[in-house]
Amino acid sequence: MPPPLQAQRLLLSHRRLPSPHRRRFTAVSSLPSSPAKTVAAAAAHAPSSILSIRESLLSGERTAAEITAEYLSRLRRTEPSVRSFIHVADAAAEREAEELDRRIATEGLDAVGPLAGVLVGVKDNLCTANMPSTGGSRILDGYQPAYDATAVRRLREAGAIVVGKTNLDEFGMGSTTEGSGFQVTTNPWDDSRVPGGSSGGSASAVSARQCVVSLGSDTGGSVRQPASFCGVVGLKPTYGRVSRFGLMAYASSLDVVGCFGSSVVDTATILSVIAGHDKMDSTSSSHDVSDYKSELVPLDLLESKPLNGMRIGIIQETLGEGVETGVISSIKDAASHLEQLGSVVEEVSLPSFSLGLPAYYILASSEASSNLSRYDGIRYGRQVSGDDLNELYGGSRANGLGHEVKMRILMGTYALSAGYYDAYYKRAQQVRTLVKKSFKEALERYDILVSPAAPSAAYKIGEKINDPLAMYAGDTMTVNVNLAGLPALVVPCGFVEGGSAGLPVGLQMIGSPFSEGNLLRIGHIFEQTLQNYSFVPPLLAES
């Protein structure tokens, strides 16, 4: 977040914004850039999709116990390098798999559920009844909830096996997963680089095929940016599409439970299970839930121009200053590919776009300062003794909370203080209204909007940890979507130079509220025709 005076200037100086400006998109080439090829041996480690797992169980080729053993074996081989998980529930996963096999034998596969035998990683800010839930913070070290988050419960009811809790930046506040109170997760494409954040553990776990799919949360890009960095599919649903019950609150008006998969099909399958109204969350929507997977068209049934008649706007402000040249090239080549599939692609200007970042950090920090006041060392988590209650509170929070969390609490408290509320918080809310209006107008003209998911590919561990402004600038592509409450899908679209096999780049697709089905359909067509999902990180060939 910019310093207070700089943020104030940005927020006070905005003027009435015109409707989005459009100009014809010009591609940099006629063909999408060729992804960097990983070694052929990686094919032997190709991940099992949800569909292939189900087919294996149905045919009797493999049991749930055998599938679980295979994933746990890969997890044990790769975890020392990747460090995706804070807690691995291997014994519990093996027991659940054996119980699934017994149920399949007696009741049949359909009775067990559509996710039978599918191993899921769960971001550690989602509550799980049978394993620790820390939020990535030492202040909750050892805390074990008495209940499952609604999204977790729905996965279990569908037959999924939770293999463990994935690492994250503390309470979701960060973009690299370096801010975890427990360990630093690495990127499976290059273990000297960050996986993104805050859901870096969930993204790296799917990328390294330590689990089939995973859950994350997205407050300002925490699913989409790590999906781009790790070369997997990441979905941020519409605000209210998935229940937040059991999610440790960071910024309640922005937080969304999302998911990762190695393909759009797997991601769509997970969304169908976790989406829907929940009486335990007053902000959850009663909007109808589709069978998102059934709406996807396989490659052999696609028309020659499957996106014919579709209008796509590429956000002009996301292709300028501060965005790496290789990322811009990959996104423009992806847009060119969308044109080849029959769509009309034009650049569109969203004049409020640059105001979103400072507004986001004011609003998110303000909400965090309230939400995190519950962690006081009394009811659960780390406690530091003191001579009186104030010393106990202060000592517990000072020792249990990390630097980034404390900094955002201070910023939020400052923005909400009596003398500065109108100058910061109220003005940020006004900017949020402008952002919503800007997206609404653009999406009345276009079926979807596209942009990079991040201004760069994965960077070196430690490169930005001491430069908060550079770190926050990495959220430029994603925070506006949270401010507007819109759904967004990230699909791998190419590679830039770096590491031994290149570094992935993700294309962000943004839609109108509750248009997840359309995003997944377009993303599936794009993915199949590029087939990026078949490329896996070098780590798997080496493990």
UniProtKB/Swiss-Prot annotation:
Q: Does the keyword Protein biosynthesis apply?
A: yes
Give the active-site positions. 123, 198, 222
Say which domain of life the source belongs to: Eukaryota
Q: Does the keyword Cytoplasm apply?
A: no
Compartments in which it is found: Mitochondrion; Plastid, Chloroplast stroma
* Single Gene Ontology BP annotation: glutaminyl-tRNAGln biosynthesis via transamidation
Q: What is its EC number?
A: 6.3.5.7
- Broad enzyme group: ligase
Any Pfam family from its record, for instance, is Amidase
Q: What does this protein do?
A: Allows the formation of correctly charged Gln-tRNA(Gln) through the transamidation of misacylated Glu-tRNA(Gln) in chloroplasts and mitochondria. The reaction takes place in the presence of glutamine and ATP through an activated gamma-phospho-Glu-tRNA(Gln).
Q: Which HAMAP family match?
A: GatA
Record text on subunit structure and interactions? Subunit of the heterotrimeric GatCAB amidotransferase (AdT) complex, composed of A, B and C subunits.
State what protein this is by name: Glutamyl-tRNA(Gln) amidotransferase subunit A, chloroplastic/mitochondrial
Species per Swiss-Prot/TrEMBL record: Oryza sativa subsp. indica
**Taxon lineage:** Eukaryota, Viridiplantae, Streptophyta, Embryophyta, Tracheophyta
Q: Which gene encodes it?
A: GATA
